[in-house]
Amino acid sequence: MPAQKRMSRYAYLVNKVAGPTLCGVFYGKYVEASDQAVSTCMAWFKIVVITKRVSAREWQEKGATVVTFRDLTRGTAPKAVECDLLYVRDFNPNTSQCWLPMLEGYKRTRTWVQIGHCNFESYGPHVMKKQLFGDFSYVPFVGYGSDVLALPETDEILEYDTSPFERFVHAVQRLNPKGESVWTHLGPDVAFAEMSIDAFNAVRESSPSPMSACMMDKTAVPQSLSEMVADYDWDHNEALRETPYVSSACAAMSRLTSSDPSLVVAVHEPKLQKYLEQFTGAKVVTYGKMLDSRMVPKRVVIFQAHPINGCKSGRKLMHMWRSMPGKPKITVIKPRQEWSAYYCNPLKRVGL
């Protein structure tokens, strides 16, 4: 598998729906992108779409079998359906309790749900898991806490492979979240800043068990984290032979910007800006600086770990761009294997 892969957001979402993962959630109010991906899959799958009445005709014309929420709540929907893919649009947890049991007769290979917003604490997520996803062991949330689906301006994704050592560090962080600032003072999915073997050993010696034990002994890693560190060899000296350590995300960004010097990298804080500028000749600017100077580049590169929607200056920047002609396109850099998203999954607490 290549170290990084650049693709359109459309291709990225189609790969998600048609790929080996048989279920998932599109999380974000911008539904056109997920609709396009599902529509494309009609060439390969028999699809049943559950949607509002206002959208029913559009999906019927595309060739999908359509069931409306009104049909489900009134009991007039088919009791048994077989399909390759069940797609639930505009899922509302507050109104779903009366019709979710109806889905027990819906036999399908894949299940994808589009959610604009969902409070997973308020209505019993175990019901959603049982009725929508059944025995699936993992339900990915595409767009959760990122700009992949939140922004219509996002049209490109750059995926990169995280190094075995970085996955090891993420696993250790799971055992001691308070130690994250010691490991990475900029952001775990972007930079392991100024990491050296001396700093690594200092953390190991100061860390309480079980974190310190796992740092030196593979067998001490809990079963829940074993897959995350499966391909790491515990040779810390080899992993940290470069000082400072250049993260996989930073290396991917460097290769991207070296091929197109016109790209502008946008980040949320000056510390991260200075770190990234150490390893590349790319133009790196903070959201606040772009806002103050009313900068409107043709394309902006951002990291999924630090979304524009995640800070006040970023949201103001998007508002400014949308009020101007020629707003920029956005490329999101993200890890191919989203371990942090896996452990922060809203359904994780109900047994996933």
Curated annotation (Swiss-Prot):
Name listed for the protein in its UniProt record: Uncharacterized protein 059L
